[in-house]
Amino acid sequence: MSDFSWPKILDKLLNGNELTSEETNALMNAWLNQELAPVQTGAFLAAFRSKNVSGLELAAMAKVLRDACVFPFPVPDLYLVDTCGTGGDGADTFNISTAVAFLSASLGVKIAKHGNRSASGKVGSADVLEGVGIRLDTPIENVVTALDKTGISFLFAPIWHSSLVNLAPLRKTLGVRTVFNLLGPLVNPFRPSAQVLGVATSELLDPIAQALKYLGLKRAVVVHGAGGLDEASLEGSNQVRFLKDGEISSSEIDITDLGLTPASNNQLKGGDLSKNEAIFMSVLKGNATKPQMEVVALNTALVLWASGLEEDLSQGVEMALNSLKSGNGLKKLLELKEFLGPKN
C-alpha cells in the first residue's frame, strides 16, 4: 500500500494525535487509489470525527482532492471568490450563500461557486439553482466561459470530483457527518483567491481558517453565526476569523453596528424545494422580507471584504442593499442562464 503504514496511521488517529502533511497525503492517495477497504475508510473517517481534525490535516486532504479533480483547462487567472457553508447547523434556512453569490457578482466580485445537492434531504445550492433553470451537467467549457463573460459560474461538485461520488454509499451507511463535509468547501477546482465560509460550530472556526491559510488563500472570512448558523446571522453577535496576507485575526460582528435590524433565525427559514426557490427568487428580485434581504446583504459585505472591493463592512452592507433593491441579483442570474441554462 504505497509507502505508508496503515496501522501506524490508524494508531495515531485513535490516540488523538495529529498526522503530518506527508502522512495525510499518503492516506488520502491510498484512498483515492482504492487501496483501502471500505472498513478502513470507515475507520479513518470515524477516527477523524472523534479526535477533531486540524487545519493542517484538512489542508493536506484538500490538496490531494483538488489535484485529483477533473479539470482539462487552465485554472482561470482571476481573483475569484467562493461563498458557502459547511452545513450541519440544523437551522433549515433558505439558500443564503447562493443568493449572496449572485448579489456579490452584481457588485463586481468574480464568483466561482462550488456546490452540491443537499445530502440531508434539505435543499442544497445545486437543488435550488437547478430549480430556477441552471443546468448542472453543462459542459465544463461552458462553466469556464460563463465565468469569463458574466463574472459568475457554478461548479457542480460531482462533475469535477468523481472520487467523492464513489464515497457517497459509505457516508450514507455511516449516517453521521464526517471530515468530507468539511472538505467540500475547500476543494473548489478553480482554486479561488478568497473565500467566505460559514461553519456550524465555533470549534471549527480556527481549523478551517488555518486550512484556508495553508491552502494559500489571500483573504478569507470564516464565520459562525449567532444562534448556531453557518452564515453570518441577524440574531446577535457573529464570531469571525479574518485571514489576510497570511495572518488570522479573531473578531465579532455586531449587526447593529452595521445599521441592520436584529431578527431571529426563524425568520430565515426555508422549506421544501419550491419554497426555497420562491424565497431565492424574491431576494434576487429585491422584494423579499426585511430579514431575508438584510441577512443576504450582511453576508455579501463579507464577500466584498474578502474580494478587496470594500474594506468597510457597513459600506459593504449599504452597497449590497442598494444592489438588491435594484434587482441586480436577478439580472446576474439571467446572465448566467445564457451560458448554463437548459438550452446549453
Swiss-Prot record:
Residues binding Mg(2+) 2: 230-231
Record-listed anthranilate 1 binding positions: 85, 116
Catalytic activity: N-(5-phospho-beta-D-ribosyl)anthranilate + diphosphate = 5-phospho-alpha-D-ribose 1-diphosphate + anthranilate
Example GO biological process: L-tryptophan biosynthetic process
UniProt superkingdom: Bacteria
Alphabetic keyword roster: Amino-acid biosynthesis, Aromatic amino acid biosynthesis, Glycosyltransferase, Magnesium, Metal-binding, Transferase, Tryptophan biosynthesis
Subunit structure: Homodimer.
Role according to the record: Catalyzes the transfer of the phosphoribosyl group of 5-phosphorylribose-1-pyrophosphate (PRPP) to anthranilate to yield N-(5'-phosphoribosyl)-anthranilate (PRA).
Family: Belongs to the anthranilate phosphoribosyltransferase family.
Protein name (record): Anthranilate phosphoribosyltransferase
Species of provenance: Prochlorococcus marinus (strain MIT 9211)
